[in-house]
């Protein structure tokens, strides 16, 4: 009834804000569920569930589902869940967990047609839904479920290691071989994210703290200068597209000598002598 819907929203707003207030350094996560916070746990999607998910996200939450691989329209991972994942893709991290415990659930009754005695079918279904949702993390649970992933579907584990989450790298970096003392250095870089997901630098708990930085390293492997490219934002890199940047450092006032140039993603507050 109307009172239930009002109370659900008030309680969810209160509890998510409370957690966000006290857990400021680690990501927070809530299930995206078609009957989120409702007295029932299955059935058609509640018309207010989508706005409740959005409320939790606005209060600093990521989202997860523990029904991946379940295709029942009443309580599985179906059209509503897929739409939520698509809506928030690359905006917040999505975490997957499989719905079936293959050692105790009758997964062969699933509409997907999983074969009895073939848990690898379930793992494949979970993996395929994870790829569609562009999940950042896969939760293999514990015990027998984890063993099943490694024993029944290890090739899928290997695929996620190479394809899932975020996979950032600079495929092109251009710096001059020589510069004059006191001159500026122009640095060009091109970055790609080869993973399904994205680098969640935009989370309020991280607050864009990870930056692309250019360093000059001396013969003792010590960074003598570190310059941050403020226009380079890793959370925007998605779908293997190239993202190119060029920035110019302030004057490099180092003694003449040989230095190794290094470009990396780091948390600048952990470094000394940062220049912008």
Question: Whereabouts are the PLM-identified features?
Answer:
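Catalytic cores of secreted or luminal carbohydrate-active enzymes
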Residues: 125-175
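Single conserved hydrophobic/aromatic residue that forms the stacking wall/gate
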Residues: 264-276
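Catalytic-core regions of glycoside hydrolase
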Residues: 3-144
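Short coil-to-beta strand junction motifs in C2/discoidin
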Residues: 200-213
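A beta-strand/beta-hairpin structural motif
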Residues: 224-253
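A short tyrosine-centered beta-strand micro-motif
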Residues: 254-263
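Short, acidic/polar linear motifs in exposed loop/turn regions
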Residues: 193-197, 220, 251-253
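Structural beta-strand segments of beta-rich domains
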Residues: 183-187
């Amino acid at each position: 009834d109307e009172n239930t819907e009002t109370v659900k929203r008030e309680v969810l707003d209160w509890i998510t804000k409370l957690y966000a207030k006290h857990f400021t350094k680690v990501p927070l996560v809530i299930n995206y569920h078609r009957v989120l916070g409702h007295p029932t746990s299955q059935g058609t999607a509640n018309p207010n569930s989508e706005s409740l998910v959005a409320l939790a996200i606005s209060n600093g939450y990521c989202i997860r589902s523990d029904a991946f691989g379940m295709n029942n329209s009443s309580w599985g991972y179906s059209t509503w869940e897929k739409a939520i994942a698509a809506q928030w893709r690359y905006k917040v991290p999505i975490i997957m967990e499989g719905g079936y415990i293959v050692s105790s659930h009758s997964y062969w009754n699933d509409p997907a047609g999983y074969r009895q005695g073939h848990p690898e079918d379930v793992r494949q279904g979970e993996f395929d839904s994870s790829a569609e949702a562009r999940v950042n993390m896969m939760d293999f649970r514990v015990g027998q479920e984890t063993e099943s992933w490694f024993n029944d579907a290890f090739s899928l584990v290997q695929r996620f290691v190479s394809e899932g989450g975020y996979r950032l790298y600079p495929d092109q970096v251009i710096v001059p071989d020589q510069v004059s003392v006191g001159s500026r250095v122009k640095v060009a870089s091109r970055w790609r994210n080869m993973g399904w997901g994205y680098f969640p630098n935009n989370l309020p708990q991280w607050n864009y703290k990870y930056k692309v930085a250019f360093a000059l390293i001396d013969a003792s492997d010590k960074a003598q200068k570190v310059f941050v490219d403020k226009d380079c934002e890793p959370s925007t890199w998605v779908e293997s597209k190239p993202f190119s940047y060029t920035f110019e450092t302030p004057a490099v006032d180092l003694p003449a000598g040989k230095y190794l140039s290094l470009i990396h993603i780091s948390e600048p507050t952990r470094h000394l002598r940062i220049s912008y």
